[in-house]
């Protein structure tokens, strides 16, 4: 069957690979100039760099299975109809959820994805949202300006600084980071096998964690929060939003009745861990 996969993130790449391995004629459209989707953000926090190998794996596997990958292709209902596929797999991912509180002008406000992509930030940063994304973003930002491994090796080999000084430089960056969460605990959606590592990084890097704090608004003064009945303002140069994600599936409505078969997978169905998205892409092939 002629299968069109729209979206080159984890779910889309696996669906395309698995479908092609079963003999289907598969084309994958990705609007960006590279495959991987949100996997590229996942590689930024400390200890996560190896996730980029997953993108390399799929790039090789898709080519090996004969999948036609078209980068820079923005999918529209008209383009899909003209392509005339037997099956469309919508794996268009998610977008950051809007903030559930007012944001006034006067302060830099960016999403966690923008922060992980390297957007410039000020020296005082407040990350709002203590889930997995917020915790890992806080760690990545707090790492800014810390000594890298090769520099530490040089200093130790040449006895250029005392061990205590080196340890301080490794554990303290150039950013003052505060993480705000309305629940009693942070990292509730982080797997038990890795949660302790993230917690240790937050502590090591001196991230100020504020739980059971409700954000009231963001304005030029900073982040206004309510905690235990008291209100306070957290000064900030940059506010980073990590308040969840919403599916991107507008195309599904436009394609209604225009294609013989339509499947929605991954974050486009509902935001989830990338491992779950990959599994869904694999399982889908049984239905084709």
Model-derived features with residue positions:
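N-terminal Rossmann-like dinucleotide/flavin-binding domain of flavoprotein oxidoreductases
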Residues: 35-83, 183, 188-213
């Amino acid at each position: 069957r002629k299968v069109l996969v729209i979206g080159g993130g984890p779910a889309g790449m696996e669906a395309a690979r698995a479908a092609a391995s079963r003999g289907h004629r598969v084309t994958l459209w990705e609007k960006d100039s590279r495959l991987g989707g949100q996997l590229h953000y996942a590689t930024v926090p400390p200890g996560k760099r190896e996730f980029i190998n997953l993108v390399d794996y799929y790039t090789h596997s898709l080519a090996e299975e004969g999948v036609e990958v078209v980068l820079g292709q923005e999918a529209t209902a008209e383009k899909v109809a003209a392509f005339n596929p037997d099956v469309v797999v919508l794996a268009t991912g998610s977008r950051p959820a809007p903030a559930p509180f007012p944001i006034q002008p006067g302060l830099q406000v960016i999403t966690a994805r923008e922060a992980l992509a390297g957007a410039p930030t000020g020296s005082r940063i407040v990350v709002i949202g203590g889930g997995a994304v917020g915790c890992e973003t806080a760690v990545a930002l707090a790492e800014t300006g810390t000594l890298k491994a090769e520099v530490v090796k040089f200093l130790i080999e040449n006895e250029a600084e005392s061990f205590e000084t080196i340890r301080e430089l490794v554990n303290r960056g150039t950013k003052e980071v505060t993480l705000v969460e309305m629940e009693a605990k942070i990292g509730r959606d982080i797997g038990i096998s890795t949660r302790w590592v993230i917690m240790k990084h937050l502590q090591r890097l001196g991230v100020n964690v504020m739980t059971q704090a409700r954000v009231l608004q963001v304005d030029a003064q900073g982040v206004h929060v309510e905690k235990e009945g008291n209100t306070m303002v957290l000064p900030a140069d940059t506010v980073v939003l990590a308040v969840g994600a919403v599916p991107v599936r507008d195309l599904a409505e436009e394609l209604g009745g225009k294609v013989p078969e339509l499947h929605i997978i991954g974050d486009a169905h509902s935001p989830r861990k990338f491992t779950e998205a990959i599994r869904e892409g694999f399982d889908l092939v049984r239905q084709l």
